[in-house]
Amino acid sequence: MKSALSVVVAAAGVQQASATFGLLGGGGISFNFGLDWSGAKTFPCPGNVVNKCTPEQENGWDWSDVATGSLNTYAGFNFGGGWSCESNFGKRGDIQGRTFGLGKVISGSCDQGDEAGLSIGVGASAGIDAFSIDSFDMSTEFDARLEFHYDMPDGSVCKQTSDCKRGGSTIVNKQCGGAKKVRVIYPKQIIHKGISFSKKCKISCHKIKWHCGKPTPKPSTSVLTLPSTSTKVIQTTPVTTLQTYTTPSQQTTTPEKETTSSKETTTSAQQTTPGKETTPAQQTTPSKETTPVQQTTSGKETTPAQQTTPGKETTSSQETTSAHQTTPGKETTPAQQTTPGKETTPAQQTTPGKETTPAQQTTPGKETTPAQQTTPGQQTTPSQPTTAATTTPATTFVTTYDTTSTVYTTSTKTITSCGPEVTDCPGKTGPHIVTVTIPVSTTICPVTETRTQSQGVPTTVILPSKSETTVKEQPTPEQPTPEQPTGEKPNPVTSQPPQSTQTPPCPPVVPRCLNTFVDLKAKCADNKDASCFCPDKDFVKNIFDCIYAHGESDNIISEAISFFQGICGRYIPENPVIATGAETITQIITVTGTPHITQVPYTTVVVATTITENSSTQTISTEVTIPNIVMPTPTGGVPNQPPATASVPAGQNPPPVTGQNPPPAVTDQSPPPAITTGTGGVIPPKPTGSVPVTAGSGRVGAGLGMVLAVAAFVAAL
């Protein structure tokens, strides 16, 4: 069975952080997650509102003190739709409600699709003005799906859908708090082959438990902070750095036209301050005694020299850092030892890195003392990744993308003179030839690529590596301000995603639901902390239920589910619920049309689960197409590195991972997506069986859709 679902995206956030679509495919649109995202208002749920209860509610309602017969009022509440109280004697052959034993129940019949249903609401004499139900003990005439619609004080409706068994089910409410009325509805049922449903269903309520008291406090977490004069936690991402090598020598390099007295005092760096980018000076500022730089090349890691000996003479270079000022990068490593000397060797390779750490204070003079104080930023050391190998049956990778070709016309023009209004005429000194290139037409062609991974080929996936974070002290305000270097500031080496002022086109229900349950979960910094909440199965299920509870229409629900799946897509290998958890919701909503968003890459992911029941094995394959979304690092949070990815050429199987650390490469500020780039595949570890996940490449297209396909086969053991 296949259900076509629409996909559109939206939101907004804090500190102008950006999220980028399409990092799987190397492109896409950047959106601004500003205060509208991080500061989104939470929905009222039983865990975050003050729930006043009457003494009767404190103990729960089991109807033992209710007279049999028609029920219209009880404990100040109004009962509508045809409730009646009856004794449950457990007649022979009657299994309805037997899970809850004998006793009294209240029952009523509902017509399919009747929005009024059976209702329970606050009356004038209830003594309270709102309520939060913790759970219902319910049973139905036959196994069926029920809906519970809560009428909220602001006029909105909070919805919950739950399956109910004939023998009895306990239905827990986690979404709707502070309601005025609840309506129990028998909705249109999900059609299964060979099963038909009656147009009317008898529903019985055995007990109601109420959520009473103050809001549930957010679980506390302990944060280890080292003693310091000033502590500041900054967000960092494991990134590649550049490496500096400085070696001592026995000779002093002297410039031809500039010499200084041998008695001059060595001038060392007086002050360095931490910053967020390394700024090499483009022009040399000669000092009394400086070590020249002969060559600048990029390396892998930035570390200061272990031993540096100042010399007596000064030379300048086109690329060197002034001896009076060093602007460090995000992470710093102080010089280990500095000793005086009479001869200076030029640095053989010196390059500013993305992350450098100078010494905070160095005592100038003929003898230079080791650094007394260093202030590195937060340093993250990723642990060795763990690997899980899985042998899977043949897997088909389907990659859909667009190819774009543009036709240009080129012409050459000669400028011999200009009008009087042109003050700087290029033809003033003679004929000037210019070339003009104009795009004529652009053609976009859809391309679909299909390839199959051979059966039995082992594929290894690098699971998310955990990071150790150390917070070190920052300099106090009394630290002297260093002299700024002269020269023009060059472009930083760091590659960052572009900042955008465009708000993501997703329904507001997404950030509101995230904030609602992030507030009830420990450790997560905010609703952008995807690495914290996406691997949590219960959290993901709560978000899907919240989207259904508060989505204003079926189209909005569909769009919001797809957007949330895009946020958590990279974590599907470790949490398949991201792909499969919304299946029930997508089966009961009706989507009209197909909303589009241009230039949004997306990936098709297939999750296969194997279920063994009695003497048969059932494999269910769920296919979901999701947008590629990378959330920015949350404010004040420590980013967790997402699962590593593998990139393979088209038509080939993903290469096995040996477990060794690959050579570092320059990365973006945002962590890379965990779903494969190109046409690679990701195979997750086994949670409860074989759950392979494959992913096609991201593509840039004119439309965006989500397809859930459930295919099953049964093989007798």
Swiss-Prot record:
Gene ablation phenotype (knockout): Blocks the adhesion of conidia to locust cuticle or fly wings. Significantly reduces the virulence. Delays spore germination and results in large multicellular hyphal bodies via interfering with the organization of the cytoskeleton.
Disulfide cross-links: 513-546, 524-532, 534-568
Sugar-bearing residue positions: 614
Keywords of this entry: Cell membrane, Cell wall, Disulfide bond, Glycoprotein, GPI-anchor, Lipoprotein, Membrane, Repeat, Secreted, Signal
Sequence repeat boundaries on the chain: 275-286, 287-298, 299-310, 311-328, 329-340, 341-352, 353-364, 365-376
Disordered: annotated segments: 237-392, 451-506, 632-690
Signal peptide positions (record): 1-19
Induction: Expression is up-regulated in nutrient-rich media and cell-free insect hemolymph.
Domain CFEM span(s) in chain numbering: 481-595
Protein's cellular compartments: Secreted, Cell wall; Cell membrane
Residue stretches of biased makeup (Low complexity): 237-254, 262-274, 368-392, 484-503
Biased segments, Pro residues type: 652-674
Modification after translation: The GPI-anchor is attached to the protein in the endoplasmic reticulum and serves to target the protein to the cell surface. There, the glucosamine-inositol phospholipid moiety is cleaved off and the GPI-modified mannoprotein is covalently attached via its lipidless GPI glycan remnant to the 1,6-beta-glucan of the outer cell wall layer.
InterPro entries associated with the record: Extracellular_membr_CFEM_dom
Prosegment residue ranges: 696-717
Lipid attachment site numbers (GPI-anchor amidated alanine): 695
Family in the record: Belongs to the RBT5 family.
Protein task: Cell surface adhesion protein that plays a key role in virulence by allowing adherence to the insect host surface. Required to orientate the cytoskeleton and stimulate the expression of genes involved in the cell cycle. Is also involved in achieving the septin hourglass shape and subsequent separation of cells.
Free-text comment on this protein's domains from its UniProt entry: The CFEM domain is involved in heme-binding. It contains 8 cysteines and is found in proteins from several pathogenic fungi, including both human and plant pathogens.
Name of the protein in question: Adhesion cell surface protein MAD1
Protein's organism: Metarhizium anisopliae (Entomophthora anisopliae)
